[in-house]
A protein has these predicted regions:
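Short N-terminal "domain-start" leader segments
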Residues: 1-33, 61, 65-70
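Secondary-structure transition/turn motif
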Residues: 34-38
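A short, exposed loop/beta-hairpin motif centered on an aromatic-Gly-Thr core
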Residues: 39-52
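An amphipathic, aromatic/His-enriched active-site/gating alpha helix that lines ligand/cofactor pockets
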Residues: 58
Length: 70
């Protein structure tokens, strides 16, 4: 499923935070998620991407799938 949004839905639903989507990185790879001043808040994308560039393209083009639950 293609998804295009600007705010993290899981961050809003589960944490009550309006946070912009951005590319983040974990040991598993790059993903689309949110963070605040304390660090990562939510992983929003179902997918992990092999590179920052691939994740950024997916974010810009809406080529990623929203996780339903954290």
């Amino acid at each position: 499923m293609s998804h295009k949004a600007s705010l993290g839905q899981l961050a809003l639903t589960y944490c009550g935070k309006f946070l912009p989507l951005e590319v983040l990185q974990s040991a598993a790879g790059h993903y689309i998620g949110t963070r605040d001043t304390e660090g990562p808040v939510s992983r929003e994308s179902r997918e992990y991407f092999r590179s920052y560039a691939a994740a950024q393209r997916a974010l810009e083009r809406g080529g990623w799938s929203q996780l339903a639950i954290p």
